[in-house]
């Protein structure tokens, strides 16, 4: 597949010239297009689609996945709070060592736990202060409002 991200540049092989963020956005665009076709599986998995993106672009990706999630099951592994906040449900995956073997634990997070986890995602393990958790709760509330706006706009 040939690709050009910059005006006036020649097309080059996608695998050679696209950054991690560009690859993430291209994958999201392709999955978004395929989601609109009949007969497409009802589940889509995005494994760290947030690689190479942040800030506003992370919010755009989160909103697009939310829109796909209106008609498909979306499973997303993410490290960005913007994407986690837009999810309808959030699970925390932890790996730990037990008797010389790696174990994985998956926990469905309650609303309060989501706020704590998003606060940690924003500021690191030591950043679970009351103000950080309040900020995360605001992020979750704003994400909920944004999803409503997106759903209303689509249904018009």
Where are the predicted features?
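Conserved D-loop-proximal element of ABC-family nucleotide-binding domains
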Residues: 12, 38-39, 51-55, 59
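Charged, polyampholytic interaction/assembly segments that form long, compositionally biased interfaces
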Residues: 17-24, 33-35, 148-153
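Walker B catalytic acidic pair
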Residues: 47-48
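GG-anchored amphipathic helix commonly corresponding to the ABC/SMC/Rad50 NBD signature/C-loop
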Residues: 1-7, 22-44
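Internal helix-turn-beta structural module
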Residues: 1, 17, 27-29, 115-124
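Short pre-catalytic strand/loop immediately N-terminal to key active-site residues, enriched for Gly-Thr
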Residues: 11-17
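C-terminal lobe/lid and adjacent interdomain/linker elements of RecA-like ASCE P-loop ATPase modules
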Residues: 56-156
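Flexible loop/turn segments at secondary-structure boundaries
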Residues: 9-10, 35, 52-53, 83-84
């Amino acid at each position: 597949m040939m690709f050009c991200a910059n005006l006036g540049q020649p097309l080059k092989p996608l695998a050679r010239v696209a950054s991690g963020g560009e690859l993430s956005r291209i994958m999201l665009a392709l999955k978004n297009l395929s989601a609109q076709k009949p007969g497409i599986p009802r589940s889509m998995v995005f494994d760290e689609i947030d690689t190479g993106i942040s800030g506003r672009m992370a919010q755009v990706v989160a909103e697009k996945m939310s829109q796909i999630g209106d008609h498909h099951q979306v499973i997303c592994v993410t490290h960005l709070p913007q994407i986690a906040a837009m999810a309808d449900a959030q699970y925390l995956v932890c790996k730990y060592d037990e008797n010389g073997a790696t174990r994985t634990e998956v926990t469905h997070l309650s609303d309060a736990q989501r706020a704590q986890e998003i606060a940690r995602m924003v500021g690191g393990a030591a950043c679970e202060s009351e103000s950080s958790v309040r900020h995360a709760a605001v992020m979750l509330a704003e994400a909920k409002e944004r999803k409503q706006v997106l759903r209303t706009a689509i249904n018009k």
